[in-house]
């Protein structure tokens, strides 16, 4: 693996050390990202996107309907045809369990909420693990969809 790849032997990022519980934050110490204008020195602020600013009769939020792609943002590991994965996701223990799927979904929605993003896309297997048969796969998807609909 590349020397630029994150180390997974660190106790804070080792997947086997995951201890998140319902209600825990995945992105602690990061509040909602808001518009602060182009002069802001806050790197966690919008400089040009002001959701409520009116442009030609609509708000920026109406014109720019941002969405997050679940697979690329929360499942992708940063690999490409030229190398091994370069990212670890601290909320992802890399198992195909419902518990891990729920954790990924909670991390995604916390992220999107803090950015003010209202839309997302996913494929069925992105959000729910495949089961031993079609009935189990469908049950897994139904369980995760119940969480996604909240």
Feature-to-residue mapping (PLM):
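N-terminal pre-domain/capping segments
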Residues: 2-150
């Amino acid at each position: 693996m590349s020397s630029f790849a994150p180390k997974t032997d660190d106790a804070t990022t080792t997947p086997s050390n995951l201890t998140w519980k319902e209600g825990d934050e995945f992105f602690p110490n990061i509040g909602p990202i808001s518009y602060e204008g182009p002069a802001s020195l806050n790197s966690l602020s919008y400089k040009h996107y002001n959701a409520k600013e009116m442009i030609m009769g609509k708000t920026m939020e109406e014109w720019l309907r941002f969405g997050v792609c679940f697979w690329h943002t929360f499942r992708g590991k940063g690999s490409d045809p030229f190398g091994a994965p370069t990212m670890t996701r601290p909320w992802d223990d890399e198992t195909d369990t419902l518990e891990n799927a729920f954790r990924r979904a909670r991390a995604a929605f916390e992220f999107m909420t803090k950015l003010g993003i209202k839309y997302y896309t996913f494929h069925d297997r992105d959000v729910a693990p495949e089961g031993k048969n079609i009935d189990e796969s469908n049950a897994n998807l139904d369980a995760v969809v119940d969480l996604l609909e909240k």
